[in-house]
Amino acid sequence: MKRLFVLLMSIMLILGVNSCRCTSDQKEVTPVVDSLAVTELVVENTISADKESVYLNHGKDYRWYETGVVLTDWLDGESDGSIEMVVNVFQVVDYIDSTSFDTYVYKYQHTQEGTVEDSVHGFWVEDYPLNDEKVTITFKDAFERVQSVNYPKPHSRQVVLRKEVGPVDANPQWIFGNSSAQIYVDAVTGEVRDWNPAFPKDTQLNYAFSW
């Protein structure tokens, strides 16, 4: 009887140890899955997060001017739309009193390693603000439209969302390309062009990417 009791206790201990090991293994696996889930950069998510950060940390009077994307691969190569970096550009007016103020330009740079905030004292004068614009075309949708059209793809990894200052009042554009060649995707209608709609077609100016 004593031997049977010892045998039963030994079996219970073995089962208990195995149960603990299974629980421990499950806890170790969970963080790995979580960490993989946050490695993909989603452009629209960074915009929302940065808007909230600017509003909470730097004041309500801000202007969202640009969102830049750096692709992992070249547009005219094997690019599948994967993203290496996203940069969101804001300008904030800091009122000192009723007659004076300072302005700062904030850039939020997102990579898989994290987010870096940079600021300079000055103005952003290259674009119209995007705050009140109805941007309905996502980055992913714009990329797919560029890949589907029969235009030569620029040798570039750069994309920017902006509403350019020009003689023609045009919608915000997703601009894919470099300083010598661009493809424009209307961020409201989705129309794809190989010329800048903010300028007459016969007086085109190439956009110089500034980041």
Labelled PLM ranges:
Residues 15-21:
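C-terminal motif of bacterial Sec signal peptides marking the signal peptidase cleavage site
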Residues 34-35, 53, 98, 119, ...:
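Coil residues (strongly favoring Ser/Thr
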Residues 57-110, 157-202:
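Exposed beta-strand-loop-beta-strand "reactive/processing" segments of non-cytosolic proteins
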Residues 4-15:
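Sec-dependent N-terminal signal peptides
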Residues 21-28:
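Bacterial lipoprotein signal-peptidase II cleavage site
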Residues 28-71:
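Short N-terminal edge-element motif at the start of the domain
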Residues 104-158:
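Long, charged/polar, surface-exposed segments that mediate recognition or autoinhibition
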Residues 209-211:
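Short, solvent-exposed mixed-charge patches
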